[in-house]
Design a protein with these regions (language model features):
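Secretory-pathway lumenal glyco-enzymes, predominantly type II signal-anchor Golgi glycosyltransferases
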Residues: 1-351
Length: 351
């Protein structure tokens, strides 16, 4: 009986050992899988073309001589645009020096109003002598019929009242964020010719206008033509976990790392970089993440993004306010109001 007991226990131990060994092998195989990838030293993300040559043909000559066909959309139909796109509404013949493009969504009416009443007020910037225009960028509804008409009707009324919405004819969705980036940059390049700087920012961020302007003032003329900045990720790894929101298969991107890129929540860039990106995005294979795609194009152009310590991807503490440029995490209206009040900028941003 005792011998049978020992044999039974031994059998049980062997089963447990084999099970653990199997789990260990699977785990090691998975770790090897997610760590694989080609070094960026061999980076040739399609298309393998000279973006500077294409840029020269498009912006420096009267006729586009490029024989290379873009692989991405070059333009999007505009459903709504402000009467004064990149002019000051109260001074139609005066162009802004800084244009802020707020990436919003159709139903985010409250977020847009919160921004208009706070850091989106042009007086926040005019107080420091900088003419600014803030525009909200939207796609269209995925619904059809009466649902589309109701939502679009509200957006139409909003634009009639405020005149600060740019709406493009692609479905508003997470998978189309790269289209929103392309459309926004094309609009900026074509309509905002006098602007020196652009900001791309999500509508759940709070911005600190004085600190943003201080950052802009420190950009040298030498650095200006290649200046782009934000919360830069220096060694970002592609996510290889299936079913993850950020999953990218090797077939789409075979490299072990992404090039450095500024996180999409807040990006500050010069007009020349916006022009370069608007061209480069047409000839670069897209991934589902707009900030990663920006990094791909910058890498092809040989441009290194600048990290800004004042751009926060999480909510701030009091100790960070002095150098804060923008902060993420303020979708809730009451939270937005309390966060804005904490910055103490109401006096310079009032009408």
């Amino acid at each position: 009986m005792y011998r049978r007991y020992l044999l039974k226990n031994r059998y049980f131990d062997i089963v447990i050992f084999l099970l653990l060994l199997f789990i260990f092998v699977i785990l090691i195989s998975y770790l090897v899988y997610i760590s694989q990838g080609i070094s960026l030293n061999y980076f040739e993300h399609p298309l393998d073309v000279d973006l500077y040559m294409i840029y020269e043909n498009e912006f420096k000559t009267a006729v586009n001589k490029s024989l290379i066909k873009p692989i991405n959309p070059t333009s999007f139909h505009t459903i709504l645009s402000p009467k004064y796109s990149c002019e000051l509404p109260d001074q139609p013949n005066v162009s802004p020096e800084l244009v802020v493009f707020v990436k919003s969504a159709l139903m985010h009416f409250e977020s847009r109003n919160s921004i208009r009443k706070s850091w989106g007020n042009p007086n926040c910037f005019l107080h420091f002598g900088v003419r600014t225009r803030t525009l909200f960028v939207l796609g269209r509804s995925e619904f059809t019929g009466w649902e589309y008409s109701d939502i679009q009707g509200l957006v139409n009324e909003e634009n009639s009242k405020y005149g600060d919405i740019v709406q493009f004819d692609f479905v508003e969705s997470y998978h189309n964020v790269t289209y929103k980036l392309i459309a926004t940059l094309n609009f900026a390049v074509n309509e905002c010719s006098s602007a020196r700087f652009l900001v791309l920012i999500d509508d759940d961020f709070i911005m600190h206008p004085p600190n943003l302007l201080q950052t802009i003032s420190e950009v040298t003329e030498t650095h200006y033509p290649t200046y782009i900045a934000g919360d830069v990720l220096r060694v970002p790894r592609p996510v290889r976990i299936p079913f993850s929101k950020w999953f990218v298969p090797y077939s789409d991107y075979p490299y072990s790392l992404y090039p450095p890129f500024p996180s999409g929540g807040t990006i500050l860039l010069s007009k020349p970089v916006a022009q370069l990106l608007s061209v480069g995005l047409r000839y670069t294979k897209l991934l589902p993440f707009e900030d990663v795609v920006i990094g791909l194009v910058l890498y092809k152009l040989g441009i290194s993004p600048v990290h800004l310590d004042g751009v926060f991807s999480v909510r701030f503490s009091n100790g960070h306010i002095d150098n804060l440029i923008s902060i993420h995490g303020f979708r809730d209206h009451s939270l937005f109001r309390s966060g804005w009040n904490e910055l103490g900028l109401q006096n310079i941003c009032k009408d």
